[in-house]
From Swiss-Prot:
GO cellular component, one term: chitin-based extracellular matrix
Function per UniProt: Component of the rigid cuticle of the spider.
Residue ranges occupied by any Chitin-binding type R&R domain in the UniProt entry: 23-84
Keywords: Cuticle
Top-level taxon in the UniProt lineage: Eukaryota
Record's protein name: Adult-specific rigid cuticular protein 15.5
GO MF, one example: structural constituent of chitin-based larval cuticle
């Protein structure tokens, strides 16, 4: 149920009204000699409204707005100085156009490949002064001869 109240104050008068249901839908408005506001809203949070302001020097503004899932949008109508539509100022272009420069990506070198490991030569387990000493099993005596008087044993 909307209710309407009005009161007279020594500086002017105002009027207001408000309604609201149990699920969150509402409407309200108020007004004085120099400004007014009205808004309706629903339980989903959508709002639509307007307000006006008039200054003593004659400047006036009216804003109509909508707030919903698409965001807040407003339309402003005013006679305030500097807001009238006019021809845009002409601007002289004094420098040539330079296209944007693409960012330079740092060069990344491929990792250096390590050389393949070399196979180790068979290690020498012992030296002997006896000729023929240290021949591997299954080889004839003296097969390990390195030089006259020296022989070595190979470990595979």
């Amino acid at each position: 149920n909307p209710f309407l109240t009005s009161s007279v104050v020594n500086t002017g008068s105002s009027i207001s009204a408000k309604t609201q249901d149990g699920i969150g839908n509402y409407a309200f408005n108020y007004g004085t000699a120099n400004n007014a506001r009205a808004e309706i809203g629903d339980a989903a949070g959508n709002k639509q409204g307007s307000y006006t302001i008039t200054d003593v020097d004659g400047r006036a503004r009216r804003v109509d707005y909508v707030a919903d899932a698409a965001g807040f949008r407003a339309s402003v109508k005013t006679n305030e100085p500097g807001t009238a539509l006019s021809a845009p100022a002409s601007a002289a272009i004094v420098s040539p156009y330079a296209p944007p420069v693409a960012p330079v990506a740092p060069a990344v070198a491929a990792p250096a490949l390590a050389a393949a490991p070399l196979l180790a030569a068979p290690g020498i387990a012992s030296y002997s002064t006896l000729i023929g000493h240290g021949a591997p099993l299954g080889y004839p005596l003296g097969a390990g001869l390195l030089a006259p008087g020296f022989a070595k044993t190979y470990v595979w």
